[in-house]
Amino acid sequence: DLGADKVVMYRYNQGILLEDSDYTLNVLPGSGPRHMIFSKDGRFAYLVNEIANNIMVFKYNEGRFNLIQAIHCVPRHFKGFSSASAIRLTSSGDHLFVSNRGHDSIAMYRVNKESGKISLLYMVHTGKGPRDFNIIDDQYLIVGCQDDNILQVLTFDEPNEKLLLSDSSIELPAPVCIAVER
């Protein structure tokens, strides 16, 4: 919940979602949690905070979160407005990506699968307002640049840890969601 600075868990019971306050994750005021994803094995959770512009890494066990790392999504020297938006893991779980509106970039991180911690590899600048993106076949990132009215294609070479902006783009009014059928 962005305004309440918490992640709320729900239980599904006979067609009804019920909030489970015993498992609410409270984060620092002003963080603005946006999206959370889990490692493939379920041991780690990655929370992107849109206001604090950071990623919080948690060890996860039986509904409990233990913070093990917090890392910025944009360079510390960046002085403009930025708001972290989407977060994705590759199917291998070896790399994590975050989009940053304002800084207009995709940040690429290496994931240590033993500790769950991440380390920044580099950032690729995109069009304006990369609100959402998705990974296609672990070879491409399709980025919806809302403020430039385009979908951009980035090429991803996982074995060599390379992410490059390609020449391919498609005009599309204010893309806000990149959904992929699996």
Please give the residue ranges for each predicted region.
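Oxyanion-binding "anion nests"
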Residues: 48-96
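Beta-propeller fold detector
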Residues: 18-25, 66-73, 118-125, 163-171
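Conserved beta-strand positions in repeat-built beta-propeller and related beta-rich domains
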Residues: 1-2, 39, 47-50, 98-101, ...
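Blade-level signature of beta-propeller repeat domains, shared across WD40, Kelch, NHL, RCC1
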Residues: 146-155, 164-182
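Beta-rich, blade/repeat-based domains predominating
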Residues: 27-42, 74-93, 124-140, 169-182
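C-terminal hydrophobic structural anchor segments
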Residues: 107-155
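Short loop/turn segments immediately following beta-strands, especially the blade-tip
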Residues: 10-17, 58-66, 109-116, 154-162
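Structural signal for beta-propeller blades
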Residues: 5-7, 53-55, 104-106, 149-151
